[in-house]
Curated annotation (Swiss-Prot):
SMART domains: LysM (SM00257). Keywords: Chitin-binding, Repeat, Signal, Virulence. The LysM (lysin motif) domains are small globular domains involved in binding chitin in eukaryotes. LysM2 contains 4 LysM domains. The gene is LysM2. This is Secreted LysM effector LysM2. It comes from the Eukaryota. It comes from Penicillium expansum (Blue mold rot fungus).
């Protein structure tokens, strides 16, 4: 038997009321309190940007409900660390709320009855992972946005640290610190505890193949030669070539405006030695195999040849070959920047 039309209408109204209540309890609007924002770069997507900060795409979307995923707007700030809160709701019947958890979040839930307010929250934090930059140096996480890509040394911010104290500890100027870590602000107002900051960086540009262990650099200027650079920094020419292979074995490709390596963490400054045979101080770097009783030395320049050196010193090419056997029988292995013997 079909129910009376009035009863059908009443049941429909009751059903709609229950559905409305269910929707009201399920579609609770969320509020985001952002603690840290980062600017997206050209080409970033929700997936790639979230992964860069150690977040899932779902968590990123929750922190940025207005983001038009999958694309992001270059230069626009997006929330990376924050709190997601459900708006307050009330109900005359008992209700249960719960929240799911992700690998980088903490959650809480509550069960209430009668007329009450329920809420849930999710707090996200950047994952403590590492990444490898283009310079081969492993970058610890988390780091503040905008940090220089070529950073080679890092410091973990602790309570009580200031930009000035960090710069002093690492013997760097404050302007460099600010340029490497723009997110801290020009007055160090945003130095976030628990984040890594850059305290040393590889300058740019550098020639390809430069040693990854370089700790000291020199900007090649007009008039510079490999010999003049090694003389300035008192390092062996062979080390300079090893650290900067792109310049070539004869310094033919020393590019103006590029930085070259003039020291590594493990290198030591070349020092003069004294020959035991005659007590004459021998400058370095010197030609390997040079005679021990040499009394006069010549620093090989970029335009020098055995013939020109011999002419200047009023000796013969044969003398140079005899006193410096490593130059070869045709005197072709004279190393730029090395000292050779020109008198005994």
């Amino acid at each position: 038997m079909m129910a009376p039309k009035s009863l059908q209408t009443g049941l429909l109204i009751l059903l709609l009321a229950k559905l409305k209540l269910a929707w009201g309890m399920t579609l609770v609007p969320r509020q985001v309190t952002c603690d840290y924002e980062a600017a997206a770069s050209s080409g970033d997507t929700c997936t790639s940007f979230a992964a860069e900060w150690g977040l899932t795409e779902e968590t990123f979307a929750s922190l940025n409900p207005s983001a038009a995923c999958p694309s992001l707007v270059a230069g626009q700030n997006y929330c990376m660390v924050g709190t997601i809160s459900a708006a307050s709701t009330t109900s005359s019947s008992s209700s249960t709320t719960s929240s799911s958890t992700t690998s980088s979040s903490t959650t809480s839930s509550s069960t209430t009855s009668s007329s009450t307010t329920t809420s849930s929250f999710t707090t996200t934090t950047a994952s403590e992972t590492t990444s490898t930059a283009a310079n081969g140096v492993t970058t610890p996480m988390p780091v503040q946005s905008g940090m220089i890509d070529s950073c080679s040394k890092f410091d973990l911010i602790k309570s009580g640290d200031t930009c000035a104290s960090i710069a002093s500890t690492y013997n760097i100027d404050l302007s460099s610190f600010y340029s490497w870590n723009p997110a801290v602000g020009s007055s160090c107002a945003y130095l976030d505890v628990g984040y890594y900051v850059c305290v040393d960086a590889v300058p740019s540009p550098v020639q390809s193949g430069i040693t990854e262990s370089c700790s000291k650099f020199d900007l090649v200027e007009s008039g510079d030669t490999c010999a003049s650079i090694v003389s300035t920094y008192n390092i062996p020419l062979s080390s300079f070539y090893a650290w900067n292979p792109a310049v070539g074995s004869s310094c033919a490709y020393l590019d103006l405006g590029y930085y070259v390596c003039v020291g590594t963490d493990s290198s030591t400054v070349a020092t003069s030695t004294t020959s035991a045979g005659n007590g004459i101080t021998t400058p370095t770097p010197d030609e390997p195999g040079m005679v021990s009783d040499c009394t006069k030395f010549w620093l090989v320049g970029s335009d020098d040849t055995c013939t020109s050196i011999a002419s200047s010193e009023d000796i013969t090419v044969a003398d140079i070959e005899k006193w410096n056997p490593k130059v070869g029988s045709t005197c072709t292995d004279v190393w730029l920047g090395d000292y050779i013997c020109v008198g005994v």
